[in-house]
């Protein structure tokens, strides 16, 4: 018979096992490789209305997650603030497994960006590794949702799969996730579209912004489903498909243009994650030793004085 007066045994805190205790974590030591962001377009195309570059803003945002890392950025086109300049004079100390990690600031496979990175690496001879782009990733859908809400096209809070009829003529009743980069980019945008549809409770479809046949097919599909206020949400930071070009495309297909992703703290977090993924894959992070692990709380485990 169980004694009801007896206290239950105290459960000691469990140690987290495995190498990846935190997806952003790796062992920090003096000489951590630099993080170089490859910004699509030219320096002029990547400038915002306030004159500040998307690369500079993203560098500040990524620095919040990786303050111990040297962060640079360079543009894949033009002759100012180029990627080749950012890859020049990287520290090749013996305590580094490589000089740097290049993170493309694109949300999907982008042939032009990949080719420019290869050219810059060949030109400089930099010992760097290249990560995947920023997408597909679940946080991209959140950023797209935020941009649509800021423009008044959708509700700011999640609808949680409940379809709600738009109350006015400004809210969207269909969304097109615009991809830039060809078939691979459309596939990545399709993943984001599914996640965004789950957030909004609306029909969300991917389309290739650079292919009018793809746009026509998707817009026709939305119209057949009853959509009269479709919105194009570009899954791009901005320089890949300028705003004026998007506005012309939207007018041609009777849709409204949404804002590009731009620099965002969530995108900065994804960039930091991509950086950590490369270092972890190279074995930079080592499993903690028994001495490095914190001792469990409890009188039996107090360190000897």
Where are these regions (language model features)?
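Active-site-proximal alpha-helix that buttresses catalytic centers in soluble enzyme cores
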Residues: 1-305
